[in-house]
C-alpha cells in the first residue's frame, strides 16, 4: 500500500520525462550531422545513459540509436532528392562510416538503394514510414 505513488505524481513524472525527451529530440535534430555518442546525449539530458535509454524507448517507442539512424536516413533521403551531392558525401555528412554502410542501412529502411532512390519519383512519401511516433 505504501509503495504505490499517487497517480498525480506518476502523471507529472511522465510529463517531466516527456519534456526532457522532447528537448533531447530537438537537440538531436540540430546535431544529426555531428558524431553523437550516448555519453554526450546522456550528459545533455542530465540522465545516466542507462536511464536515458530506458526512458527514451518508453516515450519514443524505439531505442535511441535506432531513432538517430532513422532520422539520419530521412535527412539523407531528402538530400538525395533535393541536391546534387554525391552519395558518399551525403553518407559521410550523416556520420556513416562508408558509402557501403550507408547504402546497406538505407536499403534496409526504404527497400531501395540510395542511387535508385535519387532517380525515383517516390519522394518523401516513403519517409513517413521512418518517422517515429512520440507518445
From Swiss-Prot:
Q: Which SMART domains match?
A: HTH_ARAC (SM00342)
Q: Identify the keywords attached in UniProt to this record, alphabetized.
A: Activator, DNA-binding, Transcription, Transcription regulation
Q: Which residues bind DNA?
A: 39-60, 87-110
**Coiled coil (UniProt feature):** none
| Domain of life of the organism encoding this protein | Bacteria
MF terms in GO: DNA-binding transcription factor activity; sequence-specific DNA binding
Segments forming domain HTH araC/xylS-type: 22-120
Protein purpose:
Transcriptional activator of 2'-N-acetyltransferase.
> Which PANTHER family does this chain map to?
RIGHT ORIGIN-BINDING PROTEIN
Would you tell me the protein name for this molecule?
HTH-type transcriptional activator AarP
Task: Tell me what organism the protein belongs to.
Answer: Providencia stuartii
Amino acid at each position: 500500500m505504501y509503495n504505490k505513488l499517487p497517480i498525480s505524481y506518476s502523471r507529472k513524472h511522465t510529463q517531466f520525462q516527456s519534456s526532457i525527451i522532447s528537448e533531447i529530440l530537438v537537440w538531436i535534430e540540430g546535431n544529426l550531422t555531428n558524431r553523437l555518442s550516448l555519453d554526450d546525449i546522456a550528459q545533455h539530458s542530465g540522465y545516466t545513459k542507462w536511464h536515458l535509454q530506458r526512458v527514451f524507448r518508453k516515450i519514443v517507442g524505439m531505442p535511441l540509436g535506432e531513432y538517430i539512424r532513422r532520422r539520419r536516413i530521412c535527412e539523407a533521403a531528402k538530400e538525395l532528392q533535393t541536391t546534387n551531392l554525391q552519395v558518399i558525401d551525403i553518407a559521410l555528412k550523416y556520420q556513416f562510416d562508408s558509402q557501403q554502410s550507408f547504402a546497406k542501412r538505407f536499403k534496409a529502411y526504404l527497400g531501395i538503394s540510395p542511387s535508385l532512390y535519387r532517380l525515383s519519383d517516390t519522394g518523401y512519401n516513403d519517409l513517413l514510414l521512418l518517422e517515429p511516433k512520440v507518445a
